[in-house]
């Protein structure tokens, strides 16, 4: 068994076969923990997953960069099937807040060795599903940090999120990346909103078990000139929602939890829309606006 901590939520991975070690890919190693306490969820990695006789309430098909998935939604659980050089299903039951969720997957059943796409996506989904009731969301973005605070660059795929944070790195002194694809945002009981590094960072491969308070959300779009404006709460909500996990927006319970968490985030953190060119001036414009310098 191995224990991990992401955004201060602990989870465990285990094998039923004692002779098989629990995998710990490079992107998960910074998040290994010896911290005690009841975990948010556990995943049995080599479990048997039998097909259900009843039909799901709804299904949702989507593609990955190296495969495809089917999400089946039932009244008592989600089942995500991932196909990429093989096929595996992870089963995530609904549990009451405060209970440890017991998940199971056949990723490693019968001696199988799944590729990194299957392993990462299964664990990303399991974590997102379990953390959602705790006002914790994985938000598709690239995060730059400056002076101890993070800026989350949001936008559609191909908009230039990583390009914009790279411009900060190149032209604004004292900046570093916290994550380049899948950071985790959590609303604490105090109302503070933090962004955390995670094992899911895309091609940028930035795996840091650290957190920062958020200075601002920045929704990017491409334009022939650089313009920035601060968004009201409705605009801020609309800027963030598309960057949350689409698989958790398909059912009323999880969508309500997403909307509740986002509503608290935009009360505490300002959001901006940046229409921009991929140039140094755009980076300086967003930096000076958000940090007020």
Regions inferred by a protein language model and the residue ranges of each:
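Hydrophobic positions on the alpha1 helix immediately C-terminal to the Walker A/P-loop
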Residues: 164
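A noncatalytic interaction/capping subdomain that flanks phosphate/NTP-handling catalytic cores
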Residues: 1-152, 156-157, 167-176, 184-293
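Conserved lysine of the Walker
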Residues: 161
């Amino acid at each position: 068994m191995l224990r991990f901590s992401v955004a201060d939520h602990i989870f465990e991975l285990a094998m039923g076969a004692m002779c098989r070690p629990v995998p710990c890919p490079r992107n998960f190693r910074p998040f290994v923990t010896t911290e005690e306490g009841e975990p948010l969820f556990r995943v049995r990695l080599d479990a048997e997953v039998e097909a259900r006789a009843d039909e799901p309430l709804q299904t949702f098909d989507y593609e990955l960069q190296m495969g495809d998935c089917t999400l089946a939604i039932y009244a008592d659980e989600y089942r995500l099937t991932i196909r990429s050089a093989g096929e595996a299903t992870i089963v995530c039951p609904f549990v009451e807040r405060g209970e440890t969720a017991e998940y199971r997957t056949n990723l490693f059943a019968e001696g199988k060795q799944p590729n990194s796409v299957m392993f990462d996506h299964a664990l990303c989904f399991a974590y997102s599903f379990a953390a959602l009731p705790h006002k914790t969301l994985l938000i598709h973005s690239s995060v730059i940090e400056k002076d101890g605070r993070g800026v989350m660059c949001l936008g559609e795929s191909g908009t230039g999120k990583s390009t914009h944070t790279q411009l900060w790195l190149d032209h604004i002194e004292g900046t570093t990346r916290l994550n380049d694809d899948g950071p985790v945002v959590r609303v604490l009981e105090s109302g503070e909103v933090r962004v955390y590094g995670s094992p899911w960072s895309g091609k940028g491969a930035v795996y840091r078990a650290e957190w920062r308070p958020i200075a601002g959300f920045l929704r990017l779009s491409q334009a022939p000139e650089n313009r920035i404006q601060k968004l009201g709460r409705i605009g801020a909500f609309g800027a963030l929602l598309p960057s949350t996990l689409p698989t958790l927006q398909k059912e009323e319970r999880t969508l309500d939890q997403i909307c509740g968490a986002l509503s608290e985030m935009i009360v505490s953190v300002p959001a901006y829309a940046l229409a921009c060119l991929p140039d140094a001036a755009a980076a300086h414009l967003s930096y000076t606006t958000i940090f007020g310098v």
